[in-house]
Amino acid sequence: MTTQSDAQFTARTLSEALPYIQRYAGQTIVVKYGGHAMGDASLALSFARDVVLLKALGLNPVIVHGGGPQIGKLLDKLGIVSEFKDGLRVTDEATMEVVEMVLSGPINKSIVRAINQAGGKAVGLSGADGNLLRAEKATRTTRDPDSHIEQIVDLGFVGEPSEVDISVLNALLQADAALIPVVAPVGVGADGARYNVNADTAAGALAAALKASRLILMTDVAGVLDKQKQLIREIPASQVELLIKDGTAVGGMIPKLETAAQSVNHGVGAAVILDGRAPHALLMELFTEHGAGTLVS
């Protein structure tokens, strides 16, 4: 395209986005940020700019981030062996020290710096700040194949959200503050113990408490795929359990779908599972007719 046609294309795109900008103005959008999008410098810059644009357009983005690969690298460097059960990292005291160090430290602050460098005003915090994210010990069971007796699986300091206090987020999201919260998913128990909370689950809990217009879960696939590997554009929350039972949703997609459905059932406008590897995936989802990824409504 010529320079003029480039400009016309940009202008047309902005004009077509107007109804969606008006729809979401003043609305809270909770974004779980992680996967390849967080590890790629170009995509990280694109994400930061998109978040700043959302804020400039009148939306209230709240970012919740993961950090599994970075945690794994530091554990390896320190010689701490990781064990996984049902896709969850068994978290002993030594591992929890590393989890909190990585999530609340370098990862959180790198996202904050990127957003601030792009012109925003990001503030980093964890679920421990202001009792934002209360957690309780996660419980899992497994059935012995011989005796068929259910046994409790001890995951250590792996937690699940039990209560959310959004007062600190509300203070940051006030119109005159214009701040963008960036939350590390470290929860605190009633006894003061720290818990490693799955980032998708934490984002879903915050979205429900905030009554967010959208929960967006960024991942490394296009969205939920059917058995022919084609993207499913929309799924009613009531159908999620069926897709899990019939084997359409497998592996890591199961907890994402469960989180999406639970958030919708608890007052979130809709949840979207989309490919964070696609540049400007956030903008495509919110400001174009067909969106991006899979919508759970």
Curated annotation (Swiss-Prot):
Keywords per UniProt: Amino-acid biosynthesis, Arginine biosynthesis, ATP-binding, Cytoplasm, Kinase, Nucleotide-binding, Transferase
Site label Transition state stabilizer, positions: 32, 256
GO molecular function, one term: acetylglutamate kinase activity
Enzyme class: transferase
Disulfide bonds: none
Localization, UniProt: Cytoplasm
Principal localisation: cytoplasm
Keyword Nucleotide-binding: yes
Entry EC number(s): 2.7.2.8
Gene3D superfamilies linked to this entry: Acetylglutamate kinase-like
Database matches in Pfam families: AA_kinase
Reactions mediated catalytically: N-acetyl-L-glutamate + ATP = N-acetyl-L-glutamyl 5-phosphate + ADP
Its biological purpose: Catalyzes the ATP-dependent phosphorylation of N-acetyl-L-glutamate.
Protein name: Acetylglutamate kinase
